[in-house]
Amino acid sequence: MARQTYSGPVRWVIVDDGKQQQQTTFSRKHWELVFVRPEPFWDGSNTQARNLQAGLAQIGGIEWVVIIEDDDYYAPQWLETIFGQFKNAELIGERRARYYNVQTNIWRRMENMTHASLCSTAMRSNALTLFRDIATTEYKFIDIVLWEKAKSRHLFDSQLTVGIKGLPGRAGIGSGHDRHFYGEFDRDGSKLREWLGADSQYYMNDKDGKNATQADRTGRPIR
């Protein structure tokens, strides 16, 4: 986030339900950080919906919301691109997600042409209202339901995000986190370097959690 090219004001709502609060060193002009610590703290169950609702409670109806997941990769142009795309619809996102499992070195370009992964989705206005309604435990895959129900939606191609799978810590719910996730084998890490450039160093061979980003993993600072 420190390298994002978007120069406008940002209010970053960070939801952290780990037992130990994540250390934060991030500071940037025109950025406000809001920390939310929902309780009870994570006990091994799926707290995605609970945490989303806790974050949404801090957000007003006229705000534009960009979902950022702490283990995924966002190119520096991501926020700038997103805000440029908001002219097209109330719900916007990047299609054909790119997934990379750092445990198995398996990568895959997904075929999602009718929805974006939650990590690469943004919303405003009626789409934000809809998201509040469906971000509940009733739905396992909230992103798919959101894109099915939204009336004003737009998908674009940008290759600016990568869903990083298999990091240490709590397991993700998507198929990419499974060790049996199929795709192409990246024998020498060249695909990860192609996708992430120098930032690949934070993910390559991260099998012991030394580069993990969640407080539940190592407490690595937010940046």
Go through each PLM region and give its residues:
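Active-site acidic Asp-centered loop
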Residues: 17, 68-70
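C-terminal catalytic/acceptor-binding lobe
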Residues: 133-223
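Conserved catalytic core of nucleotide-sugar-dependent glycosyltransferases
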Residues: 66-68, 75-141
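Short, acidic, metal-binding catalytic loop of nucleotide-sugar glycosyltransferases
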Residues: 1-9
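Active-site acidic short loop of glycosyltransferases
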Residues: 8, 59-63, 88
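Active-site-proximal specificity loops/subdomain of glycosyltransferases
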Residues: 21-62
